[in-house]
From Swiss-Prot:
Sorted UniProt keywords: Cytoplasm, Exonuclease, Hydrolase, Nuclease
Family from the record: Belongs to the XseA family.
PANTHER family: EXODEOXYRIBONUCLEASE 7 LARGE SUBUNIT
Record-level GO cellular component terms: cytoplasm; exodeoxyribonuclease VII complex
CDD domains, per the entry: ExoVII_LU_OBF
This protein's record includes keyword Nuclease: yes
EC number annotated for this UniProt entry: 3.1.11.6
BP term (GO), one: DNA catabolic process
Cellular location(s): Cytoplasm
Signal peptide: none
Pfam families, A to Z: Exonuc_VII_L, tRNA_anti_2
Protein name stated in the entry: Exodeoxyribonuclease 7 large subunit
Chain's role: Bidirectionally degrades single-stranded DNA into large acid-insoluble oligonucleotides, which are then degraded further into small acid-soluble oligonucleotides.
Length: 453
């Protein structure tokens, strides 16, 4: 009996693999997808793009692994000391007797950290110009309104009720999540989807809306992908996120911000009663203007009739005056023709006398021409004789003819003419030019003395 009790108290024996697998099953089966809040420490990012760090709280530490496909989806940089909330699954590795958290999603936990991330993102997107686009005017009376929001909750009901109350029009609802990991992607895809519709189905304006909440609840509306989708939209967008005091980054990129979803509906459509009153007012103005215009044109027609009668009377008078002038002109023309015929007959009688005068003038011109030709010939002969005398005289004065008779021209170094022995100097170079050429000589004192003697 005692031996059996002792046997029952002996602990069960496990191999290392068995106990490791038991611990692995215990952890993974009892802890599914969990969320853990803590502070990042020991952050390391490998060359392959995976992140390894510890999540700590006081003295407790939990190892975490964030694989690259998850890491690239995180919209802010990770830093040591950052407080975060991590979603993931616990797993155990028997090779080193440790467990770790495999990260599925990661969000900033502290309000200060979220505000810092928000400010850094705002500055970066503002530098890119995403908040300075040219705003598209909201149409006065849209035929279709696109609403991007969750179909559960009071927001969509408030928008539909307000639009129907003010001015009923067609509403196209694009259902999305307005909170959570994929909500920003869903809303961005909804904006792009509305823009890609055919023109006949495309809304005139888009409302992006959700109710109020904490900064964590509204965080999706600060996502860069949603801000870029709003910036690139060709359809005007009205944002209505949270309450009047709540501001998100999408509010800076849209064409108009509404403080509440109800206000967004009011911005989108006018009040039907006011619109009817405005239409009636315009109808009265149009009717009054039309009546005034009709009366004006009636008076214009009366004035045109008076002008027409005046011009008819004026034209008849001018026509009568023209006829009388034509008759008078015909009489004058007949008298003028008769006068010209009389003068023509008189000219025929005088024509013979004019012929005699012309023949006399021709004879006189012939005599004068003969005399003029004779005078010109005599003058030319006289000029030829004088020209011949001057040519002979000019030839006798040519110095080349003088040189042919034995004379020469003597010049000094400077090209000056020497006409006397007294102008020559000792050792002077002389140029002596004959009729058929020239020579250069140099005088010596002997030559000068010989000539002197």
């Amino acid at each position: 009996m005692i031996d059996n009790d002792i046997a029952n108290q002996v602990p069960k024996e496990f191999s290392v693999s068995e106990i490791s697998n038991k611990i692995k099953e215990l952890i993974e089966n009892n802890f599914g997808h969990i969320k853990v809040k803590g502070e990042i420490s020991g952050l390391k990012i490998s060359s392959s793009g995976h992140a390894y760090f510890n999540l700590k709280e006081n003295t407790a530490i939990l190892a975490c692994t964030c694989w690259r496909p998850i890491l690239v989806k995180i919209k802010f940089p990770l830093n040591d000391g950052m407080e975060v909330v991590i979603g993931g699954k616990l797993s155990s590795y028997s090779g080193n007797s440790r467990y770790q958290l495999s990260v599925d999603n990661l969000q900033p936990a502290g309000l200060g950290a979220m505000i810092q991330i928000l400010n850094e993102r705002k500055i970066r997107l503002e530098k890119e110009g995403l908040f300075n686009k040219k705003r598209i005017p909201i149409p006065f009376l849209p035929d279709k309104i696109g609403v991007i929001t969750s179909i559960t909750g009071a927001v969509i009901k408030d928008i539909i009720h307000r639009i129907r109350e003010r001015c009923p029009t067609r509403i196209i609802i694009w259902q999305v999540s307005v909170q959570g990991e994929n909500s920003s992607h869903e809303m961005a895809e909804a904006i792009e989807g509305f823009n890609n519709l055919e023109e006949i189905h495309k809304p005139s304006v888009i409302i992006v809306a959700r109710g109020g909440g904490s900064i964590e609840d509204l965080w999706s509306f600060n996502d860069e992908i949603l801000v870029r989708a709003a910036y690139n939209s060709k359809i005007p967008i009205i944002s209505a996120v949270g309450h009047e005091a709540d501001y998100t980054l999408i509010d800076l990129a849209v064409d108009k911000r509404a403080p509440t979803p109800t206000a967004a509906a009011e911005f989108a459509v006018p009040v039907r009663s006011i619109l009817n009153n405005t239409i009636q007012s315009y109808e009265k103005i149009l009717l009054n203007n039309t009546n005034r215009l009709i009366k004006y044109h009636e008076q214009s027609i009366v004035n045109y009739d008076k002008i027409h009668r005046y011009f008819a009377y004026y034209i008849n008078n001018r026509q009568q005056l023209l006829d009388e002038t034509g008759f008078n002109l015909l009489d004058v023309l007949i008298r003028c023709i008769a006068l010209k015929e009389t003068k023509l007959k008189s000219f025929a009688k005088e024509r013979i006398n004019y012929a005699k005068i012309i023949n006399y003038k021709i004879l006189e011109l012939t005599h004068q021409t003969a005399y003029l030709l004779k005078s010109v010939n005599n003058t030319l002969k006289n000029f030829e004789y004088k020209l011949e005398l001057n040519s002979t005289l000019l030839a006798s004065l040519d110095y080349h003819n003088v040189l042919k008779r034995g004379f020469a021209i003597v010049t000094g170094d400077a090209g000056n003419f020497l006409s006397s022995k007294s102008t020559a100097t000792n050792e002077q170079s002389l140029n002596i030019k004959f009729f058929d050429g020239e020579i250069n000589v140099v005088l010596s004192s002997h030559d000068l003395n010989a000539r002197s003697s």
